[in-house]
Amino acid sequence: MGKIIGIDLGTTNSCVAVLDGGKARVLENAEGDRTTPSIIAYTDDETIVGSPAKRQAVTNPTNTFFAIKRLIGRRFKDDEVQRDVNIMPFKIIQADNGDAWVESRGNKMAPPQVSAEILKKMKKTAEDFLGEEVTEAVITVPAYFNDSQRQATKDAGRIAGLDVKRIINEPTAAALAYGIDKKQGDNIVAVYDLGGGTFDISIIEIDSNDGDQTFEVLATNGDTHLGGEDFDNRLINYLADEFKKEQGLDLRKDPLAMQRLKEAAEKAKIELSSTNHTEVNLPYITADATGPKHLVIKITRAKLESLVEDLILRTLEPLKVALADADLSVSDVNEVILVGGQTRMPKVQEAVTNFFGKEPRKDVNPDEAVAVGAAIQAGVLSGDVKDVLLLDVTPLSLGIETMGSVMTKLIEKNTTIPTKAQQVFSTADDNQSAVTIHVLQGERKQASANKSLGQFNLDGIEPAPRGQPQIEVMFDIDADGILHVSATDKKTGKKQNITIKASSGLSEEEVAQMVRDAEAHADEDKKFEELVQARNQADGLVHATKKQVEEAGDALPSEDKEKIQAAMAAVDTATKGNDKEAIEKASQELIEASAKLMEIAQAKSQAQGGAETNAGKQANAAADDVVDAEFEEVKDDKK
């Protein structure tokens, strides 16, 4: 059985870890970094992921995707998506099923399809380290992700060629990373997770007793559209507004300028965590009829804090709700853990400290803790980690729409998973032969204000007066927090088939097609790599041949020289194309045409060898003619 890897699929950065010698180890990617930017770029002939994608973003803004996790499992008309539509340099579109998709070079792509590229890089990083194929993974998601978002994340894993053994909540994973080595005792831990695109708070009880550890999530809350990207956007908008005041030009209409502005804003935000002021300096940011324009704006830490103050305050309300749901007060919390890169901001740390009345722990790496926890959970599933029990919860209530468009809850939020619940329903009209059960997720009483997960149609009900047929619907939430539904007609005892017509998400056929596309792209990537290798070898051959021609000088007959030059030109032409066989053929012909060069080089080498031999003989002869002379030492006092 191969290793199960742990992946933190983040909004801004992603990370992969694996158990190595019983300890979770965060792996370095091909660029030598322990975290990988969650950025994907599409060019004419390849897909670029991570730091290389980030570096080329300024020159390719409309085909470079970042923060794609904010779109996963979401509808195009969602308010959160509409906010991003207006600020992202790339195109967000409405799919046929109403989902939010993206478009690059005329290709429409689902967020799970794009996210799969990041997962493929994480998979490759692990395979390079382990020296074997990896097919199984534990992937983390924000605790407040709904059913659609969790299912979409599993779809991304499948498209990347991974069997997702478990979906685990990010704060829970961080608590695992923190608590796995802790000794005896019972601790209440608050995990404050403010990442690139999402915010979660989880209250977790860690019970360590005689080597056994139980991690029980007591309550969770959050906001799946609040994170570092929103902090960046506040700064981006401020800079764009200031520039418009000074120059009268709106940078928001220029994707290239916006991409440069985004990079500069992110850099300035990070700098202001360790310094009180910085300067954003972007020469030639745009131009008009009067010439090029430059952006130079000074920003203080206080200014940044004033821009994002309401965002920080927005994180405090979920803290209050989570504590209330757990039936705890602030004083009951023993430790506070900060997770996510945005928690490095001093103002965020100050807000958390003031709320809990204690300093957060500094011994947890906010960028790596989640991946470490995922690797530990992978170890639990594979049997490599013993005596650890993880009890997670469903973040949102699940129920159905009943008469009067009211949501009736079957499973309350913060219920430990896996769990099941059933309820008996009946017909609303006489002789009704079918019922439609509308499944919802959320906390609102009004059905339409909650997330629609789908409609379950039950046909073939025997004619009877209203209220008489008894149809038992069962909700079953698995350990991934994903809902499964079945229904039984209690009169016949037969289980009826229910088709879940999801209001959004990818169908099984779409996922299967994307898996096939990914496999096809893997072959394309391999061919592209082989093509680049052939080009590089051909370029090296031409360079070496030119050098040999120069060294041969007049010793190379003009007829041979012309043949070699023609062969080199043929190689140059071939390397400009995309035919590997043509490049290899032209390279072979150049090698054959250069046969005379090899003869000249060998003759020259032999001549040099002969000259060295003669020189050696002469030196020996000269040595034989040397006469030993008598000498007398002259003392200073004889002078």
Swiss-Prot record:
PANTHER family: HEAT SHOCK PROTEIN 70KDA. The lineage of its organism: Bacteria, Pseudomonadati, Pseudomonadota, Gammaproteobacteria, Alteromonadales. The modification Phosphothreonine is found at T198. Induction: By stress conditions e.g. heat shock. InterPro entries: ATPase_NBD, Chaperone_DnaK, Heat_shock_70_CS, HSP70_C_sf, HSP70_peptide-bd_sf, Hsp_70_fam. Acts as a chaperone. Belongs to the heat shock protein 70 family. Keywords: ATP-binding, Chaperone, Nucleotide-binding, Phosphoprotein, Stress response. PROSITE patterns: HSP70_1, HSP70_2, HSP70_3. CDD domains: ASKHA_NBD_HSP70_DnaK-like. One of its GO terms (molecular function) is ATP-dependent protein folding chaperone. This is Chaperone protein DnaK. Residues 605-624 are annotated as: Disordered.
